[in-house]
Amino acid sequence: MNKKLLSLLVSGSFIAAVSTSVFAADTGVVNFNGKIVADTCEINVNYSNSTTGIVTFADTYPADYSGDGTVGTSKDFKIELIKCDPLVTKLNLTFSGTTTDTGFLRLENSETATGSATNVGITVTNKNGGTNNVKFDGSVPDVSTDVDNAGDSTPTIFNYTANVIQVGNNAPTAGKYASSATFEVFYR
């Protein structure tokens, strides 16, 4: 009987030694996978059915401006995001452009032809997030917009007001002005 017990103990010890050495290793493998999806939302800027839109202001006079930062005229515009991926729940828009100030709040007049307006710039106010002026430095704003349209044609709308403002102490001079900003969508 002792021989049977001894042989069982030796067999069990051998199996335990073999099975623990199976789990001892110095390396392993981790596999990663995912999916890259194409354009997450369709973009429509100011009824243009395009990613590029134009905001045209009403004519103003130099007398419409009374000092640095005063608004001569304003125009509302919107950026719509349609048919967003159902996984997207929040969106942010960031803006970049050439500005006249260190705070990145005033787009400069890029019209340089002879006779173009001077002392004028553009600001943009975010109507979705209160009365905050848009920064044109590419930074992501703190305010996100919830997506209303996961997978359907109901647009998620970002509403803005563009303002023509006096830049500096001298009143704007008569002439054409122009400016542009680039925006980027951040999906959350």
What are these regions (language model features)?
Residues 1-11:
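Bacterial Sec-dependent N-terminal signal peptides
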Residues 2-4, 20-188:
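Mature extracellular/passenger domains of Gram-negative fimbrial/pilin and adhesin proteins
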Residues 9-13, 109-111:
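Generic low-complexity, intrinsically disordered sequence content enriched
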Residues 12-22:
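Hydrophobic h-region of N-terminal signal peptides that target proteins for export
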